[in-house]
Amino acid sequence: MLRLRETQLKVLRYFHKFVGNNVLFVAPTGWGKTLVILSALREEGLFPALWLIRSLSIGYRVLEDCVKLGLNCFISAGRRRTCPLVLSGEVDEELIEDYCRKYRFQCRYFIKTFQIKVPKNISTYKILLEGVGNEHFCPYYMQDLISCDVMVQNYFRARRGFYKVVVVDECHNIFMPRMCRMDVDGLNDAILIIREFEEKLAGKILRLKRYIEEVGEGNIYLTQFLSLLDIQRIRQMIFLLENFKGSVARNFKRFIRIINSDIQYVEKGRIIGIRASQITFPTPTIMLTGTWFNIMDKFLPPSFKKIRVDVPENQRLNAVIVDDLTTRYDDFDYKMIQEYKKFIMQLKLKAGDKRILVFGTDRVLQYFTDLADFYEPQNIPKDWRGVMMLKARGRYSEGVDIPADIVVILGCPFYPPDIISRLSKIYSKMGFEDSWSLAATIPMLITTLQCIGRAKRSPKQKPNIVLADQRFQKYKDHLSPYLLFN
């Protein structure tokens, strides 16, 4: 029989007290948040429950805890992983969402889904895929017909069905703007596609590309080149791309996402689209995370009840702040770059054979890649040694385990000043009073802690933390619940 620890039972009693309310639950990684919430849902009969996650790897952890409690759990996935047309190569994965919206009611797999019995006692979408060959149904839509206690799915997958409660895992992500990137040269693919349908509009995109290349770095304003009608026509072209596949279709989809973004920005040959966070909460909602700063409380509705389990002092990571370095835009000049290089080389020399994991923004890391033994590797070697450099907001910034002896945050990972300014104005129009914190401070702090967390997936892992930017001094109070400053 599964037994909860005394501290878990204490938190469980709070959940019973707050049943029916919106709840924020903050506890350290590895504490057992998932198990406690599932226990509370079971005892209160709050099933079916919808459990929202960022990555499928987290979903399997939820499934494991459901099994321990005797609960039925199902992990659902998006069209790219479940559509038979994608898996057979008939439709490119980049186009499947739009293809499905247009042809769904003519699709033989979709129609067959509602003509067969719904499978029972299955736990993941992978099991559904095994039956497609015999029954010819659509696993994507079959997922929504599955009866279970806990339905696990991605934040951004459409929410169908009735649920008594919504659980938002790693809820700090709702404060992070969504980003889409593409190389400036990728606009050539967009021009190629648009020229197939409208030569004049393709000419506008060509002029836009030349403008972006001239700007080099900074804000770009698409409305200077494209009218609202132009943008609408480009969006509609996505339904006409059946003959395009691979990188051409991928770049065109990215271009549309960038068009749909609130902010467009160009940096180092890449176009970045940023969409401001849509901070909304259905009721009742349970939000859980191991990354939360008190400054974030002000953005929660008053209806939320907060349950917090602090990181014990003996489990906080030792940290130092390097006072004579900064990546602040006005100060990050040739001289400062040389000082950072000296710092990295001295650290590497002093550390010897230890593993040094360095995180930084694209703008910063580009000057130091020659000092790295590994830079954004395709796969993380198990027994790596030396210096590994990873992008602070790259594919390895969250959701992976990278054991290290030292973690270096190479500069405060703020967004560029122009982006912060525009994001702040957007949040202000949404009605948020402290819009600057929402645009600048909170994303920077979350990114910092998430990078550190890649080397701290269990209480046994205790890397030393080096915050290589004097500006971190200003945020010591925010970080002190997680770090011990020497």
Locate predicted features:
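Conserved interdomain hinge at the start of the Helicase C-terminal
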Residues: 322-357
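Conserved RecA-like P-loop NTPase helicase motor core
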Residues: 325-332, 379-469
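Walker A/P-loop
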Residues: 20-39
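Signature of the SF2 helicase/ATPase Hel1-core->accessory helical subdomain module
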Residues: 57, 64, 133-149, 153-235, ...
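Conserved strand-helix element at the start of the C-terminal RecA-like helicase core
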Residues: 49, 56, 347-369
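A contiguous, basic/glycine-rich beta-loop/short-helix subdomain that forms a polymer-engagement track
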Residues: 128-148, 159-161, 227-319, 373-379, ...
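A substrate-engagement module of RecA-like helicase motors
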Residues: 47-149, 422
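Conserved pre-motif I regulatory segment
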Residues: 1-26
